[in-house]
Structure formats: C-alpha cells, structure tokens
Amino acid sequence: YRDDMRHSRSFFRIYVEFDEMSVLKPLYTTVESFGLQVLDTILNNPRNTGNYNAILSIKNPEDRAHEQVAEYLKKIQGVRKVKLIY
C-alpha cells in the first residue's frame, strides 16, 4: 500500500474552465514554468457553447505547491475557474 500512496502523490489534477481553446497553451506554459509536466488533458466543450473545461493531470515529482500552481493559473486571461482535484 505504501507504494500506491507514494504514486498517488506523484501527480495531481486541476480542473479549469475557460473561454476559448487558445487558453490551453498559456495553461501548459504556466504549469511548465513551475518545472512540472502536463501528463494528460481531458477536454470538454459542453454542447458547443464555447464554455470549455479541462482536467489537467500534472506530474509532480517533488511534491510542489499545488495551491501556488492553481493561483497562477487563475491569473491567465480567459480562465474563469480553477479547482484542485485531490
């Protein structure tokens, strides 16, 4: 069980709501500026409304500050909502 616990802390997920697809690039750039890597993105565009949301799975080798990353993502133009998923 100990290995499973260690593995689960090696990545985290962030839910993001945003206005348009062009916001994805600055999201990735911001995550990477923390020395982290986006492993996976689950993207939704509910009913083609232009209200996009994504769940980013982020590799977190040194257990960095999730909250700090989330705060920076909130500052990106076009981002409406950011939520950490534990």
Per-segment meaning from a language model:
Residues E20-M21, K59-R64:
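Helix N-cap motif at beta-to-alpha junctions
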Residues Q37-L43, A70, K74-Y86:
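Conserved short beta-strand edge segments in small beta-sheet-based binding/regulatory domains
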